[in-house]
Amino acid sequence: MAANDAELHDSFSGKSQPGENRKASRSSKHCSRSRSRSTERKRKSGDKRHKRSHSRSKEARKKDSEKALKCQSGSEERLEFSDKGRDRLSEDTEERHRRKDKKTSRPRSHSRSRSKEKRHHNRNWDKRRSRSRSRSRDKKRRARSRSNSRSKHRHRSRSRSKSREKKKRIEKSRKKSRSPSISPVTFRGRNTAMDAQEALARRLERAKKLQEQKEKDMLEKWQHQEKAAASTPQCDPAAAAPSPALNVAALLASGTQVTPQIAMAAQMAALQAKTLAETGIAVPSYYNPSAVNPMKFAEQEKKRKMLWQGKKEGDNKSQTAELWEKLNFGNKDQNVKFRKLMGIKGEEEAASSAAVNEDGLKTLQQQEEMFRNLDVQYEMARSQTHTQRGMGLGFSSSFSSRGMDAV
């Protein structure tokens, strides 16, 4: 900045010397004007040399404007310097106005036009500087106002939240004081859920022990009663049937509590005694008496005995068995095949034929005819529906040999 100012000062001083020469020539031409005026002009021109010129080139002004925009938050020294520059500019403008008034009688020259241009440039430069300053000040004010508003709002929100928390605490304390029932003191060191589970487990264990004790007592009583019933003489098994009912009645009379399980056991014992009296078959002890029906068990045992017992000698064969054994298809091979299929043991045909009666012969002939007719009919149906894939039941030799006359 200082170097630029010095260059500008030199340039203006160089320019001012020819201007003074011109003025001197003019003064020589116009002899009517007094010397006092010329001396004043010389003084003013001398003062101008020493004074700092504020008119600058366009490039310098651009640089100054850029620097002013960059340095928005300038220091106080720069502001003071700018104020001094303003004062100087105002003084220069006043002096120029005076000169205008004095030089009204003079003819117009090139120096006036140059001074006007300088004034115009100076005014523009002042306007730009004032604008940049006003902008920087406005920005500072906005930033400060924003920061202040934010800080205020933060303080307010914090204060509000604190006040709300205080109010909540006060309300809670009031509620606690108003409630008549005193809440139990909770021990933070112990886990209440675990304590509750342990207490529940203890209760269950106690209940189990009590139940087991009751069952033991009931079993002991039942055993004593059975022993007493066994010691009493029984005439026959039929008389033993009402003993379980008597036991139940004895239990009721003694005042002990009869459970439904005991009643069921007594009923099943009575039913077993009844079946034993009727069939003579007792249910084994390894079966659960409440799960097995004694009557059905006795029937199954009878069937097993009949199945597994051996054949008695002198048993006559039934009529149907004799008929199947004496059956004749008119062909030896067919007869043998049929007997094998039916499980009939092979006997000599001579013996069987000798023993056959006249009635038996008639029945055998009728059977042979019936089988032949059935075989032919089956072959006919088979040939029509299944395109002769299979012929006959397997007893006849061939379909073609027999012919269709027997139908």
Swiss-Prot record:
This is Arginine/serine-rich coiled-coil protein 2. Residues 1-239 are annotated as: Disordered. Pfam families: SMAP. The gene is rsrc2. InterPro entries: SMAP_dom. Belongs to the RSRC2 family. Residues 1-12, 56-96, 200-227 have a biased composition (Basic and acidic residues). Keywords: Coiled coil. Residues 24-55, 97-178 have a biased composition (Basic residues). Residues 191-221 form a coiled coil.
